[in-house]
């Protein structure tokens, strides 16, 4: 009975958040990117950069003369994305590197391979994610939304902090961009059951993962500020975007989504615009700790600003991935 109620509440919260976003998108134009400065060979990693918003982020950063590493778990798709970008653009550099965020071993191997290249790291865009996946576990035993969307990015970010710190300089900070979502407003974080073992709902699991990413963003930014590190962290809400994230909707919801998607959803390029802005806009130099929606600073949920919760999640995450 409790499991059923939990599923229903998660479903209701997620779709209420969705309705609010659609109403906003109905009456407000999508954020239009301003002219952004040339990046002069700066290096960026974009997770999930093979398709959808990740591809659009990668393509646009390459167009600004960035060296972009597309990180993904589908090599054939990744190489195809690289080829397409190279054919479209005459500047910048793009390459693919294998990364499975659902595997902590793969995350560590990716960072080892990246560090072996001897490249600096100016921008890390944590974009990859899954949504509404039926109950599954990662190879490390974590619930998939929590393990891939959040925990994989948590480990990746921490392992790349050395490169980001080394690259950043006062007045020229390295940047971390974390893709959250409006679903975080309805998210709840159950620290004694982060894996949803007691009561699983794919809707609640997705919302929890997006709240966790926001808690990570705020806590990490504060840590970096205290240390005086030349690295900033900002979270981004892309809005409701017509991408493959919705492939796991049930059949009736898929049918209902189609007309709404054409009328109200953002395109992947539109959804990517705020993340691109966070990664490259000169007016955001040295500024972190923001939640950006449609190109503007926005208030996130009250729960996301809970410093005790941020700290508890950080400590628990370190224990789960084996960081001291």
Curated annotation (Swiss-Prot):
Gene Ontology molecular functions: dolichal reductase [NAD(P)+] activity; polyprenol dehydrogenase activity
Keywords, comma-separated and alphabetical: Lipid droplet, NAD, NADP, Oxidoreductase
Catalytic activities: a di-trans,poly-cis-polyprenol + NAD(+) = a di-trans,poly-cis-polyprenal + NADH + H(+); a di-trans,poly-cis-polyprenol + NADP(+) = a di-trans,poly-cis-polyprenal + NADPH + H(+); a di-trans,poly-cis-dolichol + NADP(+) = a di-trans,poly-cis-dolichal + NADPH + H(+); a di-trans,poly-cis-dolichol + NAD(+) = a di-trans,poly-cis-dolichal + NADH + H(+)
Pathway membership: Protein modification; protein glycosylation
Disulfide bonds: none
Major localisation: other
Domain of life: Eukaryota
Active site per UniProt: 206
GO cellular component terms, A-Z: lipid droplet
Family according to the record: Belongs to the short-chain dehydrogenases/reductases (SDR) family.
Function: Oxidoreductase that plays a key role in early steps of protein N-linked glycosylation by mediating two non-consecutive steps in dolichol biosynthesis. Acts both as a NAD(+)-dependent dehydrogenase and as a NADPH-dependent reductase during the conversion of polyprenol into dolichol. First catalyzes the NAD(+)-dependent dehydrogenation of polyprenol into polyprenal; polyprenal is then reduced into dolichal by srd5a3. It then catalyzes the NADPH-dependent reduction of dolichal into dolichol.
Protein name: Polyprenol dehydrogenase
Species of provenance: Danio rerio
Gene: dhrsx
């Amino acid at each position: 009975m409790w499991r059923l109620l939990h599923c229903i509440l998660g479903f209701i919260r997620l779709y209420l958040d969705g309705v609010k976003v659609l109403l906003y998108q109905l009456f407000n134009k999508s954020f239009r990117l301003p002219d952004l400065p040339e990046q002069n060979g700066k290096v960026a990693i974009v997770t999930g950069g093979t398709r959808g918003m990740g591809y659009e982020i990668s393509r646009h950063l390459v167009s600004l003369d960035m060296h972009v590493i597309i990180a993904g778990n589908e090599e054939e798709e990744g190489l195809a994305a690289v080829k397409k970008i190279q054919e479209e653009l005459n500047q910048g550099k793009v390459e693919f590197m294998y990364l499975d965020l659902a595997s902590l071993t793969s995350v560590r191997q990716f960072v080892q391979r990246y560090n072996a290249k001897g490249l600096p790291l100016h921008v890390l865009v944590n974009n990859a994610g899954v949504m509404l996946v039926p109950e599954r576990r990662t190879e490390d035993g974590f619930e998939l939304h929590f393990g891939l969307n959040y925990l994989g990015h948590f480990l990746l970010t921490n392992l790349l902090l050395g490169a980001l710190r080394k690259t950043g300089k006062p007045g020229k900070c390295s940047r971390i961009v974390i893709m959250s979502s409006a679903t975080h407003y309805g998210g709840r974080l159950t620290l004694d059951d982060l894996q949803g073992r007691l009561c699983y709902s794919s809707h609640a699991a997705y919302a929890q993962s997006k709240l966790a990413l926001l808690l990570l963003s705020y806590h990490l930014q504060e840590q970096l500020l205290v240390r005086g590190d030349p690295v900033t962290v900002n979270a981004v809400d892309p809005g409701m975007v017509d991408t493959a994230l919705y492939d796991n909707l049930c059949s009736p919801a898929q049918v209902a989504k189609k007309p709404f998607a054409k009328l109200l959803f953002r395109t992947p390029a539109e959804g990517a615009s705020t993340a691109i802005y966070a990664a490259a806009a000169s007016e955001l130099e040295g500024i972190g700790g923001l939640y950006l929606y449609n190109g503007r600073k926005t208030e996130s949920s009250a729960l996301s600003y809970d410093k005790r919760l941020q700290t508890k999640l950080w400590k628990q995450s370190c224990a789960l991935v084996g960081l001291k």
